[in-house]
């Protein structure tokens, strides 16, 4: 555990997440095992370094912290190395030679081996006219070499360094032109001024290098964010394609259900009309029989008439029972079809809402807008088809035509209104025919 604790502060490259800084190694409350707290340096984490109200480490952003099981990142932590962040902020003063010779400041630019930088870094050193008084800036060159591994050279920083060095050269040139061999005090002043200017130049260079590291860090963060967002865009596109396929399948299924529903409705309407016609005809026959019996004031107690009426009554009751059964059956099927249609409509609406919620933000927005427009046009077409089918279903119902004319007097005995007797009708009554010689 100590070897992991010593690596706190190092940077590790986590697969599928990017670069992060190790900031905690140890247990976490309510969780079994050891965990590593990593700051992902961007808002792509799950917390701010705290869990269940307890703070474990500080993060750069509110949602850049992440807890990972130690065994999953142990190999990454062991391979990581703690980067050297300390820099030299001071420089040793230049030694003044005993012969008080003029120190000249010359810039020698040497390219650094940085494959990422398009422009080589610049280093400078101080040389004397005499070889015994030469002093190089090796420490500062080593500082440049430590910083060059981070890449991404800053052009503005180089311009500022060049301006400082050019001012130093001008100052030294003026000092050289104004120097006189017998003025030792002036040489000391010029040497101290050169030393101060060199220190200021070094501080400025280090400040610019810190800015450069900061900019590189920001660029790395943006790159990681883009790498994390790209899979999300890919998932959005795949989800949109799946939703389009589901919508097409639901449209086909909905169209098929509507056709079947229209056919069943037409069939049940025709059957219902036929039953209503038969029932109304039977009711009319019953009324005619009742009126006829009342008009003649004759009891209907004859056995044959009673049996016939009972049979007719039973037939009417059976027909009414069948009618009620068909009516209830039709009502149930109509409710089932309605519920099925409502469920399909709700599912279609839910899929449309889900498609709206999963739209991406960049280049996919135009495709989502076009898909939304197509969905709206499809909904309008579906509404128009429903209205057209409802109108055609009502207008195209067939008129009931019985297969054969119904004889209202079928199965009844003949009755003569002239002589008020049974056995013959009025046209065949012998009392009504004057040419009949049987009666006189």
UniProtKB/Swiss-Prot annotation:
What is the name attached to this protein's record? Answer: Nuclear fusion protein BIK1
The record's annotation in InterPro entries points to:
CAP-Gly_dom_sf (IPR036859), CAP-Gly_domain (IPR000938)
List residues, modification Phosphoserine.
Answer: 95, 110
Gene symbol?
BIK1
Q: Where is the composition biased (Polar residues)?
A: 125-139
Residue stretches of biased makeup (Basic and acidic residues): 141-157
Domain of life, source organism: Eukaryota
What SUPFAM superfamilies would the database entry show?
Cap-Gly domain
Describe the task this protein carries out.
Answer: Required for nuclear fusion, chromosome disjunction, and nuclear segregation during mitosis. Probably required for the formation or stabilization of microtubules during mitosis and for spindle pole body fusion during conjugation.
């Amino acid at each position: 555990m100590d070897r992991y604790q010593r690596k706190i502060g190092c940077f590790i490259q986590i697969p599928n997440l990017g670069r992060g800084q190790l900031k905690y190694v140890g247990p976490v409350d309510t969780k079994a095992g050891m965990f590593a707290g990593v700051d992902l340096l961007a808002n792509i984490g799950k917390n701010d370094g705290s869990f269940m109200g307890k703070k474990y480490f500080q993060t750069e952003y509110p949602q850049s912290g992440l807890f990972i099981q130690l065994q999953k990142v142990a190999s990454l932590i062991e391979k990581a190395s703690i980067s050297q962040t300390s820099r030299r902020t001071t420089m040793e003063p230049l030694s003044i030679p005993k012969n008080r010779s003029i120190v000249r400041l010359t810039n020698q630019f040497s390219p650094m081996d940085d494959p990422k930088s398009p422009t080589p870094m610049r280093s400078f050193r101080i040389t004397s006219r005499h070889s015994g008084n030469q002093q190089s800036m090796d420490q500062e060159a080593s500082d440049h070499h430590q910083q060059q591994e981070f890449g991404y050279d800053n052009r503005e920083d180089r311009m500022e360094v060049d301006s400082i060095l050019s001012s130093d050269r001008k100052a030294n040139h003026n000092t050289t032109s104004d120097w006189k061999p017998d003025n030792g005090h002036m040489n000391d002043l010029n040497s101290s001024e050169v030393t101060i200017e060199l220190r200021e130049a070094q501080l400025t260079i280090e400040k610019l290098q810190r800015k450069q590291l900061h900019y590189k860090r920001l660029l790395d963060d943006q790159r990681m964010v883009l790498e994390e967002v790209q899979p999300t865009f890919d998932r959005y596109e795949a989800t949109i394609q799946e939703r389009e396929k589901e919508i097409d399948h639901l449209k086909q299924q909905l169209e098929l259900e509507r056709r079947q529903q229209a056919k069943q409705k037409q069939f049940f309407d025709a059957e219902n009309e036929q039953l209503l016609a038969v029932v109304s005809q039977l009711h009319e026959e019953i009324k005619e029989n009742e009126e006829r019996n009342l008009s003649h004031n004759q009891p209907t107690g004859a056995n044959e008439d009673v049996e016939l009426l009972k049979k007719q009554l039973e037939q009417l009751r059976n027909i009414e029972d069948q009618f009620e059964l068909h009516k209830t059956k039709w009502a149930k099927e109509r409710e089932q079809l309605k519920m099925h249609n409502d469920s399909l409509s709700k599912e279609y609406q839910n899929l449309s809402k889900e498609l709206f919620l999963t739209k991406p933000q960049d280049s996919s927005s135009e495709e989502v807008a076009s898909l939304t427009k197509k969905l709206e046009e499809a909904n309008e077409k579906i509404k128009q088809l429903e209205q057209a089918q409802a109108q055609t279903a009502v207008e195209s119902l067939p008129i009931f035509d019985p297969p054969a004319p119904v004889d209202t007097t079928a199965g009844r005995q003949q009755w003569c209104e002239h002589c008020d007797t049974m056995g013959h009708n009025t046209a065949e009554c012998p009392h009504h025919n004057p040419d009949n010689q049987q009666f006189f």
